[in-house]
Amino acid sequence: MEEKRRKYSISSDNSDTTDGHVTSTSASRCSKLPSSTKSGWPRQNEKKPSEVFRTDLITAMKIPDSYQLSPDDYYILADPWRQEWEKGVQVPAGAEAIPEPVVRLLPPLKGPPTQMSPDSPTLGEGAHPDWPGGSRYDLDEIDAYWLELLNSELKEMEKPELDELTLERVLEELETLCHQNMAQAIETQEGLGIEYDEDVVCDVCRSPEGEDGNEMVFCDKCNVCVHQACYGILKVPTGSWLCRTCALGVQPKCLLCPKRGGALKPTRSGTKWVHVSCALWIPEVSIGCPEKMEPITKISHIPASRWALSCSLCKECTGTCIQCSMPSCITAFHVTCAFDRGLEMRTILADNDEVKFKSLCQEHSDGGPRSEPTSEPVEPSQAVEDLEKVTLRKQRLQQLEENFYELVEPAEVAERLDLAEALVDFIYQYWKLKRRANANQPLLTPKTDEVDNLAQQEQDVLYRRLKLFTHLRQDLERVRNLCYMVTRRERTKHTICKLQEQIFHLQMKLIEQDLCREPSGRRSKGKKNDSKRKGREGPKGSSPEKKEKVKAGPESVLGQLGLSTSFPIDGTFFNSWLAQSVQITAEDMAMSEWSLNSGHREDPAPGLLSEELLQDEETLLSFMRDPSLRPGDPARKARGRTRLPAKKKPSPLQDGPSARTTPDKQPKKAWAQDGKGTQGPPMRKPPRRTSSHLPSSPAAGDCPVPATLESPPPLASEILDKTAPMASDLNVQVPGPTVSPKPLGRLRPPREMKVSRKSPGARSDAGTGLPSAVAERPKVSLHFDTEADGYFSDEEMSDSEVEAEDSGVQRASREAGAEEVVRMGVLAS
């Protein structure tokens, strides 16, 4: 099977290999390595260089991409190819210069016999198989040198030699037995005797008695004595025991008193320490877990007044103090100071299993006050006794350390390890000398399993607390992100709502402007047409196309006005007096094209109503000036109400024959009616219709719209002649009667029409000599301009040609009376 080769992708960018390399690669794959080296060695032998570079090895490693190999036979080089790799691999010039290693086989090592007598067991038989694992002790240079000396002496004595493993194992066993026996000696009366002293009391409850299940335990480092229940020791360890501060190697100061040392427990934070006795006697402080008597909690519940108390015994304000339990005594003192001074500190068990603490000051302790001189000599004696006890303990400990070898028996070690006692005695003497040279310090560190466990527990607590804080921080970060996302969402919603509100206000503003703005450019010149043709074709304008347009008219007009098709026009728009004087039929609306889509109208609804109301008022005014008609004539009312269709633009279906007259002729008609010296061609009188052609109910004005939709438009010829709109410019030249009419599009008059209405009246007053009432007529229409922008003055109104010929002279005599009637009508409206 071929060896795995490294596959390299050959390209012109990262390699200089050519097709020649490919052929050499394929050839090198078929050839073996020795055959490839034969061609190179003769040249090397000729030149005899010290080193050579072989390039065939790198060439043999590269294969082209097109070469068919299984994926297990090559590797893909992921690094970019370097040009210096083409130089080759440095190899020695002569293979004969390479030194050849010399290897020889050694016989298997047999364990030397260690028995001193023929019947003693050998080391290989009983010692090595039973030793568990390796040894904790490692030989140093001194041990190795001593072992050589020992083996030389044993060889001279014709005794078996001692190996290194046996020496290490014996030294470890000696150290283990010495540590165990010394710990046992410290715990017994032989070592110190302080545990069995009658004066030893619990550091928490100050009781010298122990019970079954509540033994008194001593710390092996600080020698503090506590009960199991008082310090929260769930199980008494078999070996040594250390308090929490000694296990952590710290010497903290109590948070509630100035004393250092003693039975301390940490707070919840783990950074501050409090005496268990202080936590029990100060009423505000509590203990989290009574079984373990930790952690100390509710430190913050201590009032400031207690922190401000000064101890009467040590004269310090450090920490917090308790006060005498007598009602009239306020003496303050620290808990530990009271214990050290021997004050009366009682623990009372109530009937409900409640523990009560009662403390008394120096004055109330033992039933009476203590004199200062008697208390002063007592203090030095107690201090001396304590010092003597400590000194005695240290002396005994030092003596035990100096006589360490007395705690170990060589025979016991030989029996444990199943070795010869004489050999173990040699090692025992060497161990004793080496340990004395080390200042009686052990050669091996003792197995402090309990200390390690306590430290590990503390580390585990700190690690769990750190992990808890980490998770808490992560949770807070998630909460912050959620709050930020909610805030951003609400801001976005607020922005969108505000934007929609602004859009709504802008739309309403535009709608209000469209409703209140006067349409500009709506009034234009109407189409010119003969009055006779309009009179003949006006009543016949109801073609089938117009009827279809009449049906669709109301819906389109109401839809363009923003109203539904079921909107009650008669009850909403026609309740006022001005609206009742105008009859709006569906046919008129359809034929006059109230189109909102035309480019000239921006404001359909105000233009529709205001212009029609204005036209109705002007029509009424013209009727008042006409002497041939009476105010009570129903024909005049009907004609006044039916002037609306003449104001509209011709529908697209109406051609030239039905086109209305152009507004250019209307100023001439107005001058013909009002002025006496007006010159113009005589107009023919069209046939006049009677009141029989009017709608059936002309006087009401509040009839519903469907009734007017079915009735045909009355007096079309006369209405078209009388109500044709005037142009804004009154100085337009009027063509002769021979000129053919031109159909022109109508435009609404702009807002400036209000100002232009007054000028024709002024000119007529100055040029023709009319009464002042005629000149004041535009003022009447100006009153309507503030409310309805589509009102016109009297000069813009036109009457039929017959009225211009018959009542031209009589009109001037009735101007003053007509003015007063119009004013009364305006006030009534």
From Swiss-Prot:
InterPro entries: Enhancer_polycomb-like_N (IPR019542), EPHD (IPR034732), Histone_Mod_Regulator (IPR050701), JADE2_ePHD (IPR039549), JADE2_PHD (IPR039548), Zinc_finger_PHD-type_CS (IPR019786), Znf_FYVE_PHD (IPR011011), Znf_PHD (IPR001965). Keywords: Acetylation, Metal-binding, Phosphoprotein, Repeat, Transferase, Ubl conjugation pathway, Zinc, Zinc-finger. It is an enzyme of class 2 (transferase). Its EC number is 2.3.2.27. Residues 536-552, 776-786 have a biased composition (Basic and acidic residues). It catalyses: S-ubiquitinyl-[E2 ubiquitin-conjugating enzyme]-L-cysteine + [acceptor protein]-L-lysine = [E2 ubiquitin-conjugating enzyme]-L-cysteine + N(6)-ubiquitinyl-[acceptor protein]-L-lysine. Residues 522-535, 637-650 have a biased composition (Basic residues). The modification N6-acetyllysine is found at residues 32, 38, 298. Residues 9-39 have a biased composition (Polar residues). The keyword Transmembrane does not apply. Residues 792-806 have a biased composition (Acidic residues). One of its GO terms (biological process) is regulation of cell cycle. Belongs to the JADE family. Scaffold subunit of some HBO1 complexes, which have a histone H4 acetyltransferase activity. Acts as a E3 ubiquitin-protein ligase mediating the ubiquitination and subsequent proteasomal degradation of target protein histone demethylase KDM1A. Also acts as a ubiquitin ligase E3 toward itself. Positive regulator of neurogenesis. This is E3 ubiquitin-protein ligase Jade-2. It comes from Mus musculus. The gene is Jade2.
